[in-house]
Structures are given as structure tokens and as C-alpha cells.
Amino acid sequence: MTTTAPASETQTFTVTEEINVRASLEQTFASLVANMGRLNEAPDGTALPMVLEPHPGGRWYRDLGGDNGHLWGFVQSIKRPVLLEIWGPLFMSTAATSNLLYRLTETPEGTLIKFTHTLVGPFPEDHRPRLASGWAALHARVRKAAETAAK
């Protein structure tokens, strides 16, 4: 027997952040790619190595070894060193999908990163507070690594 349920109201959630980095566009973009990939960590500092294939259609996934892992998304668009856009389910095990948008612009002090994460679809209420803090932790590592490389 097949049953259908009426669709509920579409849920959307958006996280935005602006990050000022005292490093060049190139250093900041390289730090972003590295820290979203092999240098990734959970907010508590636990290693969470990911693979980010930085080209259109490239995958962003957690490689657990032995052909096991978790697909987080695909590179939707990339224009080095000013744009990185990723689309996919990220860490959600629901029907939700996300769009991550990083726009980098040169400033007199270095680089400004404008970040937007838009999530559409069902997702647990208890995930909402952790979304912003997780991205903030990643962005702090990106800034620190880029600024260290700039010295």
C-alpha cells in the first residue's frame, strides 16, 4: 500500500558571517580550501579531515577509508581567488539541501570573506544553534592560517 502525506511548510535557515583576514586574496583562498579539506576540524578541535576537489563539479566529502564516507556536497562554482560555492546535503541525514557561498574581496587590510549558508528542507531544531558556531570555528581557523602564512 502506498500512502502520501501533505507537504509541510518549507523550512529555510540562513547563516551569514563576514570575516576580515589580514592576508592576500590568494593566501586566504588557499587557507579556505585547505581548512575545508584535509585540515578540517570539528569545533572542539577533533580532526575531521575532508576531501575538497576544487573544480566545478568537484566533490566535498568525508573520507572514512575503505570506500566509506559521507558526501557533503559538490562545487557548484569556483573562481579563484574570489568565489567558492558548494551545494549539497552537508552533514544532514534528511531531505534538506544547502548552498554555501564564499565571496572574497580585497580590502586595504587584506581580504573580506562574505559567507552565506542557506539550508532548505527539514532539519532538526537542535541543529540550528550549532550551525553558526560550527562555521565560526572553521572561519577562525581559516583566518589564523592565512594570517600566519602572510607573515
Located regions from the model:
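Short, solvent-exposed aromatic-acidic interface loops
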Residues: 90-93, 116-122
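A short, structured loop/turn motif at beta-sheet edges
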Residues: 21-26, 76-82, 103-112
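Hydrophobic pocket/interface hotspot
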Residues: 28-32, 60, 75, 86, ...
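A conserved amphipathic terminal alpha-helix motif
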Residues: 119-151
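Short acidic N-proximal helix/loop "leader" segments that mark the beginning
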Residues: 1-16
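Short beta-edge strand/loop motif at the mouth of beta-sheet-based domains
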Residues: 16, 23, 34-71, 81-83
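Short glycine/serine/proline-enriched coil/turn segments at secondary-structure junctions
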Residues: 67, 92-96
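Hydrophobic/aromatic beta-strand elements that line small-molecule binding cavities or substrate pockets
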Residues: 17-19, 71-77, 89, 98-106
